Amino acid sequence: MTRVTAGLKIVRVVAERRDPTAPLTVGAIARELGASVSATSRLCSELESIGLLERAEGYGAYRLGREAVRLSGAAAAPFARSVRFALTLAAQQTGETVFLVAGAAGTMRVVASVESLWTLHSPADVGEPVSGGQSAVVRAAERSDAGLDAAEPRYLESTVGMTIEVAAPIVGPGGECVAVLAVRLPVNRADQNLSRARHAVAAAKRSIEHGIEEWHARVPDRGQSAPPAVPHAPGETPTALAAALRILRHLATGRDSVSGTARATGLRPDRAQRLIDACRRAGLVWAGHDRSHYQLGWIVQGWYRAAAAPTMVERGKPFVAQTAERTNTCGFLTTLKGMRSFTLVEELEMAGEGLRMSPWLGRAHPIIGSDGGPTLVMDLDDDEVARLFPARNTRQELDVFLRRVRGVARDGVLTMEAFDDAGIVSISAPVRDASGTVVAAACLVGTTAHMRANTVEFERETRDLAARVSSLLD
């Protein structure tokens, strides 16, 4: 195993967990890879120097680095919005957990998920490994639509324990399976939801594949017209791992040939080929069906998603506390969970003696009455929001909601009266992750009198809070 392959496998061990920001010791990494502690320690130190890892609390412990998060976000950026919409719509249609799985070098992990809001449900956490020959997900990964009779279903099913899986491969333009889309539901809801799950998987598969086709049409193979070489100091010869990172960054923006990659990264073609081969052995790069072009594997796309929530909770909480104290308001960070707003962080300050704000930490709220609801879906167009909007709400409520979505998309901040709480005004602004999509809403909430008297200042504070939290994620 080359040094580059070993180093990138270390990154995968750290990155492909439910929480890649949690400390992982050199000893644990070495045991996972069957390597010596001393060699692993040296590689971790070099990976830290180029930003793929960073030091964590505890002796000899590491967590995922900023460059790895940026790489992951860049790889997901062309597909993040369409994947999010497809998974959220399928979750709305079924009420069950909908998720995307990608594989590399013999392992498969969840890279995106919208979890069911039922109390009893079948989970699928980002970073979770998927294995077992009985699993519909595993079997779907070995199959494409090629050669299927028109009458054959485009999905596979399995029952393991008390969980049913309905899965279908996401097929790229070359016929390769780039990922697997699936729904998980408890056996006891099969009569109610299994048929819905089948239809939802088929529709979401078409939606995601259409997004992939559109992107490939916009970004053709670059082998004949590579961009200019990346800037670097004259005479600079990057280390093998630093050069591999250049290649990964380049392939995150689209597939390319060896010669195109060499030109774009400022590396010799022979060195670029060796490094691409090392990246392939680590499971991060795929060869195209004709072996003339290479691309980043979809498993990388799970890294930034798994890191987002724990980063906001750990590192974003002090920012929320400072802003809430400075403005004498309640501060929140909320994310989208299905079509509900879910509170990750809260600081309950309040203007007014004798007043108290009820806590929302760890609770979900219907999006129609959520402080950050319109902000959380501002990346979607009106038709997509309408398709996701809960059927129990009226057309008038949808129209009001859409006006607010358009307002925050235009202004970058939204001030609104609480939907069902008299005397409260909220201000929200978008928090964006490494893919550039909205991952959370930063919200300030207070009494109507206090918020209206300070609207301009508090809108600025909310934008600043959102920008500071966004900077943690990219």
How should each PLM-predicted stretch be described?
Residues 78-92, 136-168, 196, 208, ...:
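Short, basic/aromatic recognition patches
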Residues 1-73, 226-307, 463, 467-474:
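N-terminal helix-turn-helix
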Residues 51, 110-112, 179, 345-346, ...:
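A structural microfeature
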Residues 13-16, 31-32, 46, 82-93, ...:
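Amphipathic alpha-helical regulatory segments at dimerization interfaces
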Residues 145-153, 160-161, 177-241, 401, ...:
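Juxtadomain coupling helices with adjacent low-complexity linkers
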Residues 63-146, 305-389:
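Amphipathic alpha-helical effector-binding/dimerization core
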Residues 170-173, 431-434:
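Sensor-regulatory modules in signal-transduction proteins
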